[in-house]
């Protein structure tokens, strides 16, 4: 079973990300996660994407156990020549405090994790930078669970007039998610603190 169902990022989504990355690259000073920010109390987000680059070791472990990972549209996935796999989740909307970047960012799309006829889907991710967690809606239920713990220790943040960039967000599996996945797939592969990867947020700001 193939681990990933790969498809290139769509042109519109890729164009948005490239534009925001280019703007971030032109800036030489980054605000830390808990400092600097700007002269606005809050910034409203109305688009962009969050990219999740998956840890290579975790991918290998999942592949060896027979798992398949597929994006739920409009999320997309791409693989670099190096083998690095990145999922892109479009941003629906959100808001961040300019002073410390606390707030929430809501996304569209999600992920399906499958093995031996069993599929668990999670979608509509919400990043809560204040709580340091990413929550997800479980497909087929009304439940929303804490899916990933977010480590902002190495965060680099940039806020501009029309965009915001949060780079280097570490993502690990929560205890609740690990328990649910182990129960669904009758395995002990998933553990609290399992390294999932690194997230980079490229957000466009509302006018």
Model-found features: residue ranges?
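Extended hydrophobic/Leu-rich segments
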Residues: 3, 120, 155-160, 205
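Acidic, glycine-rich flexible loop segments
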Residues: 124, 130-175
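N-terminal segment immediately downstream of the Sec signal-peptide cleavage site
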Residues: 32-100, 155, 164-207
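Predominantly extracellular/secreted and cell-surface proteins with exposed
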Residues: 72-146
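Secretory targeting and sorting signals
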Residues: 1-33
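Poly-acidic low-complexity segments
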Residues: 2, 54-55, 128, 154
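Intrinsic-disorder/low-complexity peptide segments enriched for small residues
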Residues: 1-4, 11, 21, 145, ...
